[in-house]
């Protein structure tokens, strides 16, 4: 455990200016970001007598291995820089108000030619407009069903849309006039987009104009004696009014505002936000965060004095992330991410700076204030009651989970005689079918919970091939690849740390950030416990690799199937954990997650191999022209017997491409026709190329990329179901 005095900046080197500071752990990972009006005063408070610090603050400073800072000219700049760093580094000791992916929203895919309306749960995407979030999915579907009478927009998936386009008949919704059937050309793309835009305007609060327009059209149809159209418009108006009844007016002055409320205890805080647009509540959102994770001495603050800090942290993180979305994606109400008015229970200490920052994000004046009387005060009290209820329910739900996870980690520590509880556990597993498509997975659990952004998968290169596989050698290969990366990244961090200025300036940018991905180096952070799926041979192989690489601070165990024995290197007998223990359950869950993730990648790799075509390797031949070739000749077998001239008869195929096609199909005539040119064409991309290692990672909207570099579908945060493991994969 580092001693704070070992990295304390020299006396007089910390400036007495406003700025933002970062604490890093010995591995270079940023663990806390904060800002201060006076860096000298704030940082010196961290290096006081450690025994006088609050336990949570003490844990942060003793975990850290270095501190850095950046001086800024104004507090608004400090506010922006602090938000950017928290978003970039995801420090473990900072409070994070993450989107609750379980809240359903109504999504409108404006980035498609024919926009689609559907219920969605997951991270926000650019080019998609969102309305909500709603507390229940059925509420969205009920409202959508009502509005489709008036706005018959597309709701089907891309696959259904293409299928009905091919068969030339609309779906059931098209026959009952709840879809304008753009799939069969009943309306043009422009007409359908206008329907969708009217739908968005209605949900965004611009309802009066739509209702008045419909009433005028109904009156005109009646005067023209078109009573059928008038009756349909009358029903449409009734449907709109029924939908409006579900969003009662709560603020009669047509206010656009967000009302924020908090409920706290000594360890946690719940926050609720009501989004009011046009005087109506358009959405509700809630979070619960652990105050224990922040380096602020919460226990020294009373319930009233900690609220300004919570308000400041929430406003900077929430509106910073909302404004960072593509403006075309929209916010919850389908309009500006920052409303004209933000109502909070108390004003933060730097309310003027935050209000200026919010106004900059919006592009116009934003008011930040506390409601004092009237309807806004009453609604704020309702939001406050919701926050208290959310905190109470959360504590009941999480009490058992937190207790069991703590007991599991402590039980593993005692059973394996570890120096400390294994807060970070990594597990690897191998998957293949009779030695083909051999792959491996690496999953990461922190504090007993999966950290899917750190998941990786691998294609076995040396220990498998030609229909054979050696599980023990595969375990050794993956262990070596993982910890070679660890040593390499750790070496980069150590080398970069030596470049730190004597005055405590920032580390070189390449220290903690991977230049290839722009993200923190994940492999420089080692596990406390490394679990392999297998018994004594597998764990011995992994331990031998760690010894070879000089990794001495990582414990290794193997979890054997069937008897669920825990094997420790160098021990003749396994450790037997009680069948009902939380420790064994956690290890099983980690092992099963690694197994599931490996099988997911194996099936993907096997599917690509089984559906691959020789035409896939032809340079410049895309999917459209491949389809045209097969459609023209009827099959690949007939294509093989064709000549260059016959292939050139297919639209879009020239002589060079035709020659390359015959060369890829391996026909005898190809060599004569192509000569040296065909031999110079690139060969088909093989598994080795497909599985080339990549260190790239992706955002919260996408899944992290794999060590093998071929995509990481299984680790996406939006993944809601576990794939079923079949008997064919092991």
Swiss-Prot record:
GO terms for cellular component: cytoplasm; excinuclease repair complex. Gene3D superfamilies: 5' to 3' exonuclease, C-terminal subdomain, GIY-YIG endonuclease, UVR domain, UvrC, RNAse H endonuclease domain. The keyword DNA damage applies. GO terms for molecular function: DNA binding; excinuclease ABC activity. This is UvrABC system protein C. Belongs to the UvrC family. Interacts with UvrB in an incision complex. It is found in: Cytoplasm. HAMAP family: UvrC. PROSITE patterns: GIY_YIG, UVR, UVRC. CDD domains: GIY-YIG_UvrC_Cho (cd10434). Signal peptide: none annotated. Residues 208-243 form the UVR domain. Residues 16-95 form the GIY-YIG domain. Residues 678-730 are annotated as: Disordered. The UvrABC repair system catalyzes the recognition and processing of DNA lesions. UvrC both incises the 5' and 3' sides of the lesion. The N-terminal half is responsible for the 3' incision and the C-terminal half is responsible for the 5' incision. Keywords: Cytoplasm, DNA damage, DNA excision, DNA repair, Excision nuclease, SOS response. PANTHER family: UVRABC SYSTEM PROTEIN C, UVRC/OXIDOREDUCTASE. GO terms for biological process: nucleotide-excision repair; SOS response. The keyword DNA damage applies. Its main location: cytoplasm. It comes from the Bacteria. It holds the Pfam family UVR.
């Amino acid at each position: 455990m580092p001693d704070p005095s070992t990295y304390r900046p020299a006396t007089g080197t910390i400036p007495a200016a406003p700025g933002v500071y970062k604490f890093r752990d010995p591995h270079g990972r940023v663990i806390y970001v904060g800002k201060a009006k006076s860096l000298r005063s704030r940082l010196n408070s961290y290096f006081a007598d450690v025994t006088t610090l609050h336990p949570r603050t003490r844990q942060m400073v003793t975990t850290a291995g270095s501190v850095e800072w950046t001086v800024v000219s104004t507090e608004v700049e400090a506010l922006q820089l602090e938000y950017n760093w928290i978003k970039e580094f995801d420090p473990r000791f900072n409070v994070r108000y993450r989107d609750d992916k379980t809240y359903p929203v109504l999504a409108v895919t404006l980035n498609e030619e024919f926009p689609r309306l559907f219920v969605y749960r997951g991270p926000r995407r650019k080019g998609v407009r969102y309305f909500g979030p709603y507390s229940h999915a059925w509420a969205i579907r009920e409202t959508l069903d009502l509005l489709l009478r008036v706005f018959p927009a597309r709701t089907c998936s891309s696959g259904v849309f293409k299928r009905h386009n091919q068969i030339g008949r609309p779906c059931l919704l098209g026959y009952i006039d709840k879809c304008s059937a753009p799939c069969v050309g009943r309306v043009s793309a422009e007409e359908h987009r206008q329907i969708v835009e009217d739908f968005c305007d209605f949900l965004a609060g611009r309802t009066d104009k739509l209702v008045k327009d419909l009433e005028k059209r109904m009156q005109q149809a009646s005067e023209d004696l078109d009573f059928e159209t008038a009756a349909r418009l009358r029903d449409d108006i009734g449907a709109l009014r029924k939908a409006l009844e579900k969003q009662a007016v709560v603020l009669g002055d047509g206010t656009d505002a967000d009302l924020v409320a908090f409920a706290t205890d000594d360890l946690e805080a719940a926050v609720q936000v009501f989004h009011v647009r046009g005087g109506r509540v358009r959405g509700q959102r809630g979070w619960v965060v652990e105050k224990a994770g922040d380096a602020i001495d919460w226990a020294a603050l009373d319930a009233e004095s900690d609220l300004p800090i919570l308000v400041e942290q929430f406003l900077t993180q929430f509106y910073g992330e909302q404004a960072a979305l593509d403006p075309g994606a929209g916010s919850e109400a389908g309009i500006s991410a920052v409303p004209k008015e933000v109502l909070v229970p108390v004003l933060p200490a730097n309310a003027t700076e935050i209000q200026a920052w919010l106004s900059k994000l919006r592009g116009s004046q934003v008011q930040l204030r506390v409601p004092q009387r009237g309807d806004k005060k009453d609604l704020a009290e309702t939001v406050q009651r919701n926050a208290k209820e959310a905190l109470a329910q959360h504590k009941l739900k999480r009490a058992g989970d937190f207790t069991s996870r703590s007991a599991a980690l402590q039980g593993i520590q005692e059973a394996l005689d570890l120096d400390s509880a294994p807060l970070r556990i990594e597990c690897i597993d191998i998957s293949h079918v009779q030695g083909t498509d051999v792959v491996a997975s690496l999953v990461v659990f922190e504090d007993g919970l999966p950290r899917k952004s750190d998941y990786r998968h691998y294609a076995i290169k040396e220990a498998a091939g030609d229909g054979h596989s050696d599980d023990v050698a595969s375990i050794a290969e993956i262990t070596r690849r993982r910890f070679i990366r660890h040593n390499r990244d750790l070496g980069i961090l150590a080398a970069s740390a030596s470049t730190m200025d004597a005055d405590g300036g920032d580390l070189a940018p390449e220290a903690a950030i991977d230049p290839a991905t722009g993200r923190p180096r994940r492999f420089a952070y080692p596990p406390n416990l490394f679990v392999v799926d297998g018994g004594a041979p597998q764990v011995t192989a992994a331990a031998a690799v760690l010894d070879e690489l000089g990794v001495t601070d990582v414990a290794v165990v193997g979890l054997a199937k069937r008897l669920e024995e825990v094997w420790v290197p160098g021990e003749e007998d396994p450790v037997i954990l009680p069948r009902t223990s939380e420790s064994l359950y956690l290890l099983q869950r980690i092992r099963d997650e690694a197994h599931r993730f490996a099988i997911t990648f194996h099936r993907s790799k096997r599917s690509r191999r089984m559906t691959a075509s020789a035409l896939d390797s032809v340079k410049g031949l895309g999917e459209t022209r491949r389809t045209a070739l097969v459609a023209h000749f009827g099959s690949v077998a007939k294509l093989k017997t064709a000549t260059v001239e016959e292939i050139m008869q297919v639209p879009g195929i020239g002589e060079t491409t035709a020659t390359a096609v015959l060369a890829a199909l391996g026909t005898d005539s190809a060599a004569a026709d192509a000569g040296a040119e065909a031999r110079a064409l690139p060969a088909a991309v093989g598994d080795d190329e497909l599985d080339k290692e990549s260190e790239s990672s992706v955002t919260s909207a996408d899944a992290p990329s794999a060590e093998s570099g071929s995509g990481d579908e299984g680790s996406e945060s939006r993944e809601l179901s576990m794939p079923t493991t079949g008997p064919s994969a092991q």
